[in-house]
C-alpha cells in the first residue's frame, strides 16, 4: 500500500509541476517542452531503476549521459537546473519559485521512499521461521484431526496448507511490489498515465 501511495503522489506532483510551469513560466515553447519531457522521463526512469532494468529506455525523451548510474537523480537535478535558470532570469517571483521547488523536491522524496521499500525486505530468519511453521502444521495437524474427522483429515489439512502457503507467497510479492508479475504494482500503466496527463496539460 505504501508503494501504491507513493506512485499516486508521483502522479499528482507530476501534474502539479506541469501546471505550475505552464502558468508561471511559459504557456508554450521550448521551456515548457523541456520540463514536460523531464517530468515524463522521470517516471519511466524510476520504474526502470526500481526494477533494475537498463536506465535508458525508448520512453526517455531526455538525453542521459551513458556514465549516469542513477537516472532519476540526474533528471531531478535537471528539473532544479531549469528552476534555477528561470529564477535567475526573473521569470519567477519568490513565491512562484518556492511553490515549484516544493513540487520538484517531492520527486526525490518519492524516489528515496521507493528505494527504501525495495531494499528493506523481510529478514531471512523470518522467512525460515514462517516456512518451518508451515511444515510443522503439515506434520502435526493430521494427527490432531484424524480421530475426529477420519478420512476428512486429508482434505481439511490440504485446504489449510493451501491458505498458509498462499499467504507466504503473497507476503513475498507484497514486500517487493515493483516487479513485472500481475500481482505487482502496475508501474507501466502509471507511467503511461503520467505521460498522458502531463502531455494534456502542456500541449493543449
Spell out what each predicted region is:
Residues 17-126:
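Structured inter-helical modules in multipass membrane proteins
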Residues 10, 30, 34, 38, ...:
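Aromatic-enriched hydrophobic runs in primary sequence
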Residues 1-8:
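Juxtamembrane membrane-water interface segments immediately C-terminal to a transmembrane helix
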Residues 11-43, 49, 178-204:
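Solvent-exposed, non-transmembrane helices and loops of integral membrane proteins
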Residues 8, 14, 18-21, 41-45, ...:
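Small-side-chain structural scaffolding
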Amino acid at each position: 500500500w505504501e508503494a501504491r501511495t507513493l506512485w499516486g503522489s508521483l502522479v499528482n506532483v507530476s501534474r502539479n509541476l506541469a501546471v505550475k510551469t505552464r502558468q508561471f513560466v511559459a504557456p508554450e515553447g521550448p521551456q515548457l517542452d523541456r520540463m514536460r519531457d523531464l517530468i515524463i522521463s522521470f517516471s519511466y526512469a524510476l520504474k526502470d531503476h526500481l526494477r533494475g532494468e537498463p536506465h535508458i529506455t525508448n520512453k526517455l525523451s531526455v538525453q542521459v549521459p551513458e556514465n549516469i548510474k542513477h537516472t532519476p537523480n540526474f533528471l531531478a537535478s535537471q528539473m532544479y537546473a531549469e528552476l534555477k535558470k528561470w529564477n535567475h532570469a526573473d521569470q519567477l517571483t519568490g513565491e512562484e519559485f518556492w511553490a515549484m521547488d516544493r513540487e520538484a523536491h517531492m520527486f526525490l522524496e518519492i524516489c528515496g521512499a521507493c528505494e527504501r521499500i525495495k531494499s528493506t525486505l523481510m529478514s531471512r530468519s523470518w522467512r525460515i521461521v514462517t516456512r518451518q511453521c508451515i511444515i510443522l502444521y503439515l506434520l502435526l495437524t493430521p494427527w490432531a484431526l484424524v480421530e475426529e474427522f477420519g478420512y476428512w483429515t486429508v482434505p481439511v489439512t490440504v485446504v489449510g496448507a493451501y491458505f498458509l502457503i498462499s499467504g507466504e507467497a503473497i507476503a513475498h510479492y507484497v514486500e517487493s511490489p515493483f516487479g513485472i508479475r500481475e500481482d505487482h504494482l502496475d508501474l507501466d500503466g502509471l507511467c503511461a498515465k503520467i505521460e498522458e496527463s502531463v502531455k494534456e496539460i502542456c500541449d493543449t
